Each structure stands twice: as structure tokens, then as C-alpha cells.
């Protein structure tokens, strides 16, 4: 017997914003999602954060995009329907979906709650799904996914400011917990004060760490110290300041995705210090062994987090009232926002107001 067609697999008509080629320009787009399965949650999308990854995918800058492409993996909304076996949430609950909608849940990583390192992971958009179709993201009026990949939003956490935590928040929270350097009595640095960096400062301070922001821009100093509550600011273009900070930090979260030198950062670490890379510059790193040998230092990496840890992160954010600093934008202004994002003209995250501004084509 022949399998179901894509139209039969995905009978629910919906709409969103899609890129159709590597220009990255988004336009209204009609498509379909699957019917609600017994372990699925369907929800109305209220807000969706705009991540720099969305821009990379829309423009096919990593060479793996498939079109049409509906971006968005910082998705929050209100549950409208649940399958008969769903126990995690109910209709009316506020929920979120981050970067993943389909790890295998059987491999060693999945069994260890490391869904984010599953070799068979299904991304929230532009990824082959188990039914052979391509996933579409949260720049759309509704979502449906297995309840395993749903996280619950704390009641006190604003949905718009909380949306970017589903990518930016877990991206900085996970390495702080795993590498153990954000805790009372520790001194960490956040290199780069953008979408990731500003959230990293908030989480690290809430964990009790002393925090220094490192930036190439003197203009970020006031925000770092007075808006975000960092303890110190280090201008990385000032050799004297860097020399004075030698051996200062237990750990450095390196949030920068552009090409930059990392060897000077290693000199800022204490012995046994850890430099954790969160950005992915397109060029290889220039790294020598000597700075690592002298002090038993480590260069490591981290990518988002598993579903269990993402829920833990949201609960922590709710307890400490942590949200991203956002600029809310309408669907009509999505391409302008992406252009500004490419230029770094955002303080600090764009969030798409889906429910109020996204109209059916």
C-alpha cells in the first residue's frame, strides 16, 4: 500500500513568512502542518524571536538551506489542542519551542538528556522530518510538535521578552552550568555584548558570579555597567587594559561569530580557566598550544541545550525575572529588521509580534 502524500500527512492549512531563495527576502507564504497526533501539542504562535541563525539560513550562508524556508526557533504561544496521550500541558497553557522538534530519543545523547547533540536531530525549520517533509519554523500563525519538545513558560515571565531565551538563553545557560564557572566567588567574562552576550550577563549575575564584559566598542560600556549590571568593562582594543587583566577570569564565554583573535583571550584566564566558544566564525581559529599548556587552560564549545535543561533555564529565568532586552517588530517590517540585524543595529534582540501583525496571504 502506498504511503500518504504530503498533503495527507499535513492537512492543516496555515501561513507564515518564507524566504524563497538566497536573497533572504521574506514574503507571505501558505503551507500546511500535520494533524494533531496523540502525543502532539498544537499552539497559536504569539511571538517569535529573530535569531542571527534565521538570517544565515534565509540567505543560505551555510549552504544547507532548502526553499521555501520559514525561519524561527524562538517560538512562544498558547496551546489550542493536545493529543489524547499528552500529559505535559493543557489547552490554554503558555508554551515554547526552541531549536529542536525531533531528536531520535534513543541514542546515548538523547538518553542523557542531551537532545541537542543527537546525530539524528530534527531542527525546527529547514530540516528533513521523519515523515519526509521539511520543517517550517515559527514565523507562522501556528505550530504543532511532539510534547517532548514543548517547554512550559513560567506564569510571571513575559512571553515577548522570554522568547529569545529559547535559543540565546539556553545557549549561554548550558555552558555556565556544565563548565561550572558561573557561581558565587567566580569571576567570568562575556566577550561580545550582543544578543547572546547581554543575556549571558544577566544569567551569570543571577548565579552569583562577578562579571566583566569584553568589547571592542567603548560605546557598550554604559549598557554593560548601568543597564545590565556587569561589574566591570574591558575594552579589547586597549593593550594596556588587556595586560592589566592577565590571569583574571575563571571562564570566558565567547559569543562572537565574526573572525577574531582568541589567543589574547587565553591570557586573561586563570590557571585551569576555560574559554567556551558559542559563536561559529566561518574561518578556522588561529590557535597555538603554548597558551593552553601554560596554566592547563581549555578551549571548548557548546551548542544550545537539551529539553530538560531548557525547561530548567526557563524556570531559573522566571525565578530571577530574566528576559532579553527586545525590540518588538511587525510582520510588515520583517525584512527591514533582518537588514538591521545583519548590520548589528539591534539592542539587543528583535521579536516578531506574530499574533497581532501576521496576516493571512
Swiss-Prot record:
The gene is ADH9. It comes from Catharanthus roseus. One of its GO terms (molecular function) is zinc ion binding. GO terms for biological process: alkaloid metabolic process. The keyword Oxidoreductase applies. SUPFAM superfamilies: GroES-like, NAD(P)-binding Rossmann-fold domains. Belongs to the zinc-containing alcohol dehydrogenase family. Class-III subfamily. It comes from the Eukaryota. Gene3D superfamilies: Medium-chain alcohol dehydrogenases, catalytic domain, NAD(P)-binding Rossmann-like Domain. Pfam families: ADH_N, ADH_zinc_N. CDD domains: CAD1. Its cofactor is Zn(2+). Homodimer. This is Alcohol dehydrogenase 9. NAD(+) binds at residues 53, 192-197, 221, 278-280, 356. Binds 2 Zn(2+) ions per subunit. An alcohol binds at residues 53, 73. Keywords: Metal-binding, NAD, Oxidoreductase, Zinc. InterPro entries: ADH-like_C, ADH-like_N, ADH_Zn_CS, CAD-like, GroES-like_sf, NAD(P)-bd_dom_sf, PKS_ER. Its EC number is 1.3.1.-. Zn(2+) 2 binds at residues 104, 107, 110, 118. Zn(2+) 1 binds at residues 51, 53, 73, 167.
Amino acid at each position: 500500500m502506498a504511503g500518504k502524500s504530503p498533503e495527507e500527512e499535513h492537512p492543516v492549512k496555515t501561513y507564515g513568512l518564507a524566504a524563497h531563495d538566497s536573497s533572504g527576502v521574506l514574503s507571505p507564504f501558505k503551507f500546511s502542518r500535520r494533524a494533531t497526533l496523540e502525543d502532539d501539542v498544537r499552539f497559536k504562535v504569539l511571538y517569535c524571536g529573530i535569531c542571527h541563525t534565521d538570517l544565515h539560513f534565509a540567505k543560505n550562508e551555510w549552504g544547507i538551506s532548502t526553499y521555501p524556508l520559514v525561519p524561527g526557533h524562538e517560538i512562544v504561544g498558547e496551546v489550542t489542542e493536545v493529543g489524547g496521550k499528552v500529559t505535559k500541558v493543557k489547552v490554554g497553557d503558555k508554551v515554547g519551542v526552541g531549536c529542536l522538534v525531533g531528536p531520535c530519543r534513543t541514542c546515548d545523547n538523547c538518553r542523557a538528556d542531551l537532545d541537542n547533540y543527537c546525530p539524528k536531530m530534527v531542527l525546527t525549520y529547514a530540516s528533513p522530518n521523519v515523515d519526509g517533509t521539511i520543517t517550517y519554523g515559527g514565523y507562522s500563525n501556528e505550530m504543532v510538535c511532539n510534547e517532548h519538545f514543548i517547554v512550559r513558560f513560567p506564569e510571571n515571565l513575559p512571553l515577548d521578552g522570554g522568547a529569545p531565551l529559547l535559543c540565546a538563553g539556553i545557549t549561554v545557560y548550558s555552558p555556565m552550568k556544565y563548565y561550572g564557572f558561573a557561581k558565587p566567588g567566580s569571576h567570568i567574562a562575556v566577550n561580545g555584548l550582543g544578543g547572546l552576550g547581554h543575556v549571558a550577563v544577566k544569567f551569570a549575575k543571577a548565579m552569583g558570579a562577578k562579571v566583566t564584559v569584553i568589547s571592542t566598542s567603548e560605546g557598550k560600556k554604559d549598557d554593560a555597567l548601568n543597564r545590565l549590571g556587569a561589574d566591570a568593562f574591558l575594552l579589547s582594543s586597549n593593550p594596556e587594559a588587556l595586560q592589566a587583566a592577565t590571569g583574571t577570569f575563571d571562564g570566558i564565554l565567547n559569543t562572537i561569530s565574526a573572525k577574531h583573535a582568541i589567543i589574547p583571550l587565553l591570557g586573561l584566564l586563570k590557571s585551569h580557566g576555560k574559554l567556551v566558544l558559542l559563536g561559529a566564525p566561518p574561518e578556522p581559529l588561529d590557535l597555538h598550544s603554548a597558551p593552553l599548556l601554560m596554566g592547563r587552560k581549555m578551549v571548548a564549545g557548546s551548542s544550545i541545550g537539551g529539553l530538560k535543561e531548557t525547561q530548567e533555564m526557563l524556570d531559573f529565568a522566571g525565578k530571577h525575572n530574566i528576559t532579553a532586552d527586545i525590540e518588538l517588530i511587525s510582520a510588515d517590517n520583517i525584512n527591514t529588521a533582518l537588514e538591521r540585524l545583519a548590520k548589528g543595529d539591534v539592542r539587543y534582540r528583535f521579536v516578531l509580534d506574530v499574533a497581532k501583525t501576521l496576516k493571512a496571504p
